[in-house]
Regions:
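Sec-dependent bacterial lipoprotein signal peptides
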Residues: 1-18
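Hydrophobic, glycine-enriched assembly/anchoring segments
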Residues: 478-534
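Structured interaction patches on ligand/partner-binding surfaces of diverse proteins
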Residues: 118, 123-125, 166-219
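Tryptophan-paired
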Residues: 64-169, 234, 240-488, 498, ...
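Bacterial Sec-dependent N-terminal signal peptides
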Residues: 16-43, 233, 489, 531
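Contiguous beta-strand segments within globular domains
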Residues: 30-65, 228-234
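Intrinsic-disorder/low-complexity, polar/charged segments enriched in Ser/Thr/Lys/Arg/Asp/Glu/Gln
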Residues: 36-40, 134-138, 217-219, 230, ...
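Extracellular secretory-pathway ectodomains of glycoproteins
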Residues: 217-243
Length: 534
């Protein structure tokens, strides 16, 4: 396999088979033998580019990113599609490729070995690599051309790349076919973890020069990006207790007193799209695809709010409340109605080794929908199962006549009954926790002592929180364009800042606007979700 992090130059003579077999004989013919084009193609994995999120500046040219893990960056194989005559990714769907070439796993393994030999000759130890941001290949291409036209000028070539999806040269013969193409899957899950992340062009910009000779090759620079997105949990702010993140819960009243501890046991992605998106990102003015552009830019305004949509293959179906069949097709077993099972007792608990390094929950496909449909049945999010442990305001008895509470010491995993006042805003210092239900009810209904509250039971102290992945909008304005959603090659990272008491005693997928979940979103280089308040 080949990493996309170092520069490599090799010469490969291509017996490139273009689309002649699928094209009318009277329109296309091979270029004359001996009149070949010499090309230097540089593939640049999007590892030093910009964010689509506000960190602090959002949009296609934002400023937040981070490098991917090694297994996310590996290049196993790739197919090159060549456009000529100034054609671009947004040209007519009937546009014919003037050339195609597949670089197989075996070829890249050989190239990798040659590169390692070069390093060894230069004194580098076996296995050590010189890390760069690009990989360069040099090769000759016999071109297929239109009979009625001269050969394309060297500066009119554009290269389209799809990596880690095998040989596509016989699958796609026109630009329209390729643009409508979708991978079988955007990554491959194995017993050792995810591998073979499918990648494709990140933009429609090509840096080219040269005349196409050996001495002056056509130099093309193509930036590629992963089709998958990643969701991370950032445990910063927690203390690890035997690998379990534990948070201090404090009230907002003066004193900064620790009122409870929150132990985070399990997490799972909900509404993770099971359907891969198109090979190339699509943007449009609205969810229906008006003024659709391939590899277009997301365009935010000053506050980070998006002004256009990224379109996935199902976006136009997500403009009204869904039916069960659509939700099952989109999200499979990860649909939010299955949240309880996703963090059930048969699922492993978190066992972290660091409270400063992000923990990857998993990978998801693009998932975008109409802004008015920003509800929990479409939005990709995370369900978090925790144990809540009151440290203050825990009582073992209550005398309703004297209105005297008997304080006690809470034991972790003990069932408790929370009394919460019936007020519009509640601080954690206003909640009371009781060892038995009778005392909790007596206190909550003791109107003679001006107590007005509700009682909630927490079996074994277990509670649940939900949060949903925000893609744009760094202010708390609800239902803006692309506020919630998943876009390729982003890392959606969330923090927990517990300050609102225990979550719900059973999974309760509330609407996104009720969660106050601000999410950091960076390019992969990464997407960070702002702090999620739970």
């Amino acid at each position: 396999m080949k990493l996309l992090h170092y520069i490599l130059t090799t010469f490969v003579l291509l017996s490139l088979v273009a689309c002649k077999d699928s094209c009318p004989e009277d329109l296309w013919e091979p270029r004359a033998i001996g009149d070949s084009l010499y090309v230097q193609l540089t593939l640049d994995l999007l590892n030093s580019s910009s964010t689509t999120r506000a960190v602090p500046n959002g949009g296609e040219e934002g400023d937040g990113w981070e490098y991917g893990y090694t297994y996310e960056n590996q290049l196993h194989n790739f197919t090159v599609f060549v456009l000529g005559y100034n054609a671009t990714i947004n040209s007519s769907p009937n546009t014919i490729f003037v050339g195609k070439r597949y670089f197989s796993d075996d070829e890249l393994e050989k190239i990798d070995s040659l590169h390692q030999e070069e390093l060894n000759l230069k004194g580098y130890p076996e296995g050590q690599e010189v890390l760069k941001d690009v990989t360069t290949y040099e090769f000759t291409i016999p071109i297929v051309r239109e009979q009625a036209r001269e050969m394309p000028n060297a500066d009119t070539y554009r290269f389209i790349v799809v990596a880690n999806h095998g040989d596509l040269t016989e699958t796609y013969h026109t630009l329209g076919d390729l643009r409508n193409g979708m991978p079988d899957k955007a990554w491959t899950d194995t017993s050792d973890g995810p591998v073979r992340f499918v990648m494709s062009n990140e933009n429609d910009q090509y840096h080219s020069n040269g005349t196409g000779t050996t001495e002056d090759p056509v130099c093309l620079h193509v930036t590629i990006e992963r089709m998958a997105a990643r969701i991370d949990y950032d445990p910063t702010g927690s203390t690890l207790v035997s690998g379990t993140p534990r948070y201090d819960v404090k009230g907002v009243t003066p004193g900064n007193e620790v009122l409870a501890h929150l132990y985070v046991d399990r997490m799972a992605i909900v509404n993770g799209s099971q359907q891969p998106s198109y090979f190339f990102k699509r943007v449009a003015d609205d969810i229906n695809g008006t003024n659709l552009k391939y590899l277009g830019d997301e365009t935010p305004i000053a506050r980070g709010e998006a002004t256009n949509y990224v379109i996935d293959p199902y976006s136009t179906q997500k403009t009204t409340p869904p039916n069960n069949e659509l939700l099952t097709t989109l999200y499979g077993n990860s649909r939010i109605s299955n949240a309880a099972a996703l963090v059930g007792s048969d699922k492993p608990t978190l066992s972290l080794t660091s409270n400063t390094f992000p923990y990857t929950l998993g990978y998801v496909n693009e998932n975008t929908f109409d802004a008015p449909q920003a509800w929990s049945y479409y939005a990709t999010g995370v369900v978090v199962q925790c144990r809540y442990a009151p440290q203050k305001h825990f009582y073992t008895a209550y005398n309703a006549t004297t209105d005297v509470l008997t304080e006690g010491a809470y034991e972790l995993n003990q069932t408790f009954y929370m009394v919460e006042p019936n007020t519009p805003t509640i601080d954690e210092s206003q909640r009371l926790y009781f060892q038995n239900e009778a005392d909790a009810v007596a206190y909550a209904t003791n109107t003679a002592k001006k107590h007005f509250g509700k009682v909630v039971k927490y079996e074994n102290g277990v509670c649940y929180y939900f949060t949903y992945m925000r893609h744009s909008n760094k202010v708390e304005v609800i239902h803006n364009t692309m506020e919630f959603g998943i876009v390729r090659n982003n890392i959606y990272r969330f923090k927990l800042l517990p300050n609102t008491g225990p979550g719900t005693p059973t999974p309760d997928p509330r609407h996104p606007e009720e969660l106050k979940a601000r999410v950091y979103v960076k390019k992969w280089l990464s997407v960070e979700h702002p702090i999620i308040y739970v």
